[in-house]
Amino acid sequence: EMTSSLVGSEMCIRDSRKKVAKRRLNMQWFKIPEKIYFEPGSVQYLAKMPDMHRVMIVADPGMLQFGYVDRVTYQLNKNANQPSIEIFSEVEPDPDLTTVRKGVEVMNSFQPDVIVALGGGSAMDAAKAMWLFYENPDADFVGMAQKFMDIRKRIYKFPKMGKKAKMVSIPTTSGTGSEVTSFAVISDKSKNMKYPLADYELTPDIAIVDPEFVYTVPKGSTAFTGLDVLTHAIEAYVSILANDYTDALALHAIKLVFKYLPKSYATADKEAREKMHNASCIAGMAFSNAFLGVNHSLAHKLGGEFHIPHGLANAYLLPHVIEYNGQPTPTKLAAWPKYDHYICLLYTSPSPRDSTSS
């Protein structure tokens, strides 16, 4: 709309059209570890891995107590390089900054060229943070923990990784997908806070998704971690940063969860456990590139404040978040059509909101 007015003897023309700055777009990308091994017995890769001389294993006490660390050291001892091995087995659930600092001190003393993260999300996340500060002692934790919308556009830039050591992640639960993601969640329990760190530099170099490590996981952990997988896949699928590559992975992970989680929980069937282990990794690749949503934001706050298991917190929230996102209001137009398309295959309802609520 053009408007005019007379000022003195001159005509002044004002252009009242809204001016919008051109949005700077990054090229689309899809980033995952260099190698992913994913069959029973795939831990044997460690016996063949080249260029390893000093290996530090980061785990929780249970990994040492129940012999999982022994499975790893057995393969390392078969390696032609005969690497020296250091074990740090003090990672607790929701690893604290103090634990990370303690692990970094051990790394600085031992000087590993390979770090093996063995365990659930806590061990893998702690190992990533230790790796970060081992490689970059002057890294700014406050800057790295800053909030952001797009991981590629924030002000703080993570330092380069891999100058001193490679990261190998071996998950022993089927939930976090941390073995293939660019995320690490570190707690400050003195403040009841969780800090999600996110940058593609945190992506492990190698993931070993060996289902033999999850055959005996207890039923409760199987349920909680399985629902975490489902939440990862659903949130990645309806993310505003989703794309053709992440959609394919997210949808397949959802199908695997619905088909195999009940049997994995009820009978510990080996095939079901293997499929859920794959689903966890597949969902991890999806959300590492499409990112997550309000469900995980709230779950991290709940976990930080009340120390609820992460998968359980997600399970509490997921039905409510789906219903909230399923309302076709102007601020959420990106989400509900993608929910509705597949939910309508299961429920016949007169509107997207009704089918999503069902």
Model-derived regions, located:
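Gly/Pro-rich interdomain helix-loop hinge
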Residues: 305-349, 353
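Glycine/threonine-rich beta-strand-loop-alpha-helix active-site module
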Residues: 98-105, 109-209
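ATP/NTP phosphate-donor binding region
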Residues: 20, 25-114
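Carboxylate- and glycine-rich phosphate/diphosphate-binding segment that chelates Mg2+/Mn2+
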Residues: 180-290
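Single conserved hydrophobic/aromatic residue that forms the stacking wall/gate
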Residues: 1-15, 347-358
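Glycine-rich phosphate/pyrophosphate-binding beta-alpha loops
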Residues: 175, 285-294, 299-308
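Predominant activation on well-ordered alpha-helical scaffold segments within soluble catalytic domains
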Residues: 47, 73, 86, 101-104, ...
